[in-house]
């Protein structure tokens, strides 16, 4: 595999070290994701997949090991540099949408762009295009409370892609939806990912959805293996 967008080498992570309730979550994890590759991370609840995603996305730091994004080592970077990389290069999606309730769908997509220095006009144009791409352009002026669960998650997808990241990290992105809605929303996500050429690491316990991705890996007992 050449030109990885993400490379993790020997990642370990423990909590409460030295205490009676100490737990090791990740044990020497190695992972490479190529540009444009979509990888399914299959793991049961509590296996450490959220921790792995947070370390990959610079929201947390490993105890040992290296994280490289496009070949750049993340350890030792200033907080400002890590934040800049996280904002520009990484998009996050969670099981719950975390949309700002006081803003409408379009505004939830516009705001992260403004924080990244994009003009309001350009941000509004991109928001409209993303909402159209996931089939809910007509819902742009609606606040999250007026949207269905599937619509809320589609807006969350658009927000994650607002700043045109190079890599998408998703933690059970359809886990809070019923099966029928889950399939439709996942289709919308995959279409966005494929159309933009994104690399993606998507955690899911849904084996049918995992099978639709380029590759599957399993996290168990703190270690990764191919499925």
UniProtKB/Swiss-Prot annotation:
Keyword Oxidoreductase: no
SUPFAM superfamilies named among the record's database cross-references: P-loop containing nucleoside triphosphate hydrolases
InterPro entries: AAA+_ATPase (IPR003593), ABC_transporter-like_ATP-bd (IPR003439), ABC_transporter-like_CS (IPR017871), ABC_transpr_LolD-like (IPR015854), MacB-like_ATP-bd (IPR017911), P-loop_NTPase (IPR027417)
EC number in record: 7.6.2.-
Pfam families: ABC_tran
Domain ABC transporter span(s) in chain numbering: 6-227
Localization of this protein: Cell inner membrane
GO biological process: lipoprotein localization to outer membrane; protein localization to outer membrane
GO MF term list: ATP binding; ATP hydrolysis activity; transmembrane transporter activity
UniProt main location, coarse: membrane
Keywords: ATP-binding, Cell inner membrane, Cell membrane, Membrane, Nucleotide-binding, Translocase, Transport
Protein's membrane topology: Peripheral membrane protein
Subunit composition and interactions: The complex is composed of two ATP-binding proteins (LolD) and two transmembrane proteins (LolC and LolE).
PANTHER family on file: IMPORT ATP-BINDING PROTEIN, LIPOPROTEIN-RELEASING SYSTEM ATP-BINDING PROTEIN LOLD
Similarity remark: Belongs to the ABC transporter superfamily. Lipoprotein translocase (TC 3.A.1.125) family.
Its biological purpose: Part of the ABC transporter complex LolCDE involved in the translocation of mature outer membrane-directed lipoproteins, from the inner membrane to the periplasmic chaperone, LolA. Responsible for the formation of the LolA-lipoprotein complex in an ATP-dependent manner.
Protein name listed in UniProt: Lipoprotein-releasing system ATP-binding protein LolD
Species in which this protein is naturally found: Roseobacter denitrificans (strain ATCC 33942 / OCh 114) (Erythrobacter sp. (strain OCh 114))
